[in-house]
Amino acid sequence: MEAIGPNKHGNPFIGHEHTLYDISPGHVYAKSKRMVEQLVTKANNSVIMNGAKLYTCCLRPTGIYGGGDKLTKVFYEQCTQHGNIMYRTVDDDAVHSRVYVGNVAWMHVLAVKYIQYPGSEIKGNAYFCYGYSPSCSYDMFNLLLMKPLGIEQGSRIPRWMLKMYTCKNDMKRILFRKPSLLNNYTLKISNTTFEARQQCRTRFQLLPYL
């Protein structure tokens, strides 16, 4: 996802693989994702050592979740420390597409299958990974996952307070090399809509698990 956006200007993205968007990553992680996607795409149709052709495509997961997700575990533990309350940091209208990890794995299997077909349309292209998971804010999605575990919705933390915390955390990262989940970058992207409407159902014959 971050090979495309959200960009450093905080512009929302609602569209598919061919939607025009100002791709201007503002963080080293997003920049590296963009560079890797360009390298993989460029390698398509190249000749490898044994004279065979190499075919490539790129897959873009949009917020992976599922079994073994350490980030979800961290959020859950934070909620339990606050009396099973989730204090919100994200605007409700900042909608994000999410994808189950099993769908991402299955898309990789299907990509390997269909990229070998003569005349395959997926060669040299990039596709968002998708499923049947609801599109909503990060906070609301996490609440959907954790409500059966007894987590309740709390109040929203004021934006000025969040900005103060992110500035403090960014300074700690610079001075002491101590990273934090909440920083200026994560605050911006989580509060910027990124909703992908995918085309890979027809190209991959994909039927998602979730």
From Swiss-Prot:
GO terms for molecular function: 3-beta-hydroxy-Delta5-steroid dehydrogenase (NAD+) activity; steroid Delta-isomerase activity. One of its GO terms (biological process) is steroid biosynthetic process. It catalyses: a 3beta-hydroxy-Delta(5)-steroid + NAD(+) = a 3-oxo-Delta(5)-steroid + NADH + H(+); a 3-oxo-Delta(5)-steroid = a 3-oxo-Delta(4)-steroid. NAD(+) binds at K33. The keyword Transcription regulation does not apply. Catalyzes the oxidative conversion of Delta(5)-ene-3-beta-hydroxy steroid, and the oxidative conversion of ketosteroids. The 3-beta-HSD enzymatic system plays a crucial role in the biosynthesis of all classes of hormonal steroids. During viral infection, steroid production contributes to virulence by inhibiting the host inflammatory response. This is 3 beta-hydroxysteroid dehydrogenase/Delta 5-->4-isomerase. It comes from Variola virus (isolate Human/India/Ind3/1967). The gene is OPG174.
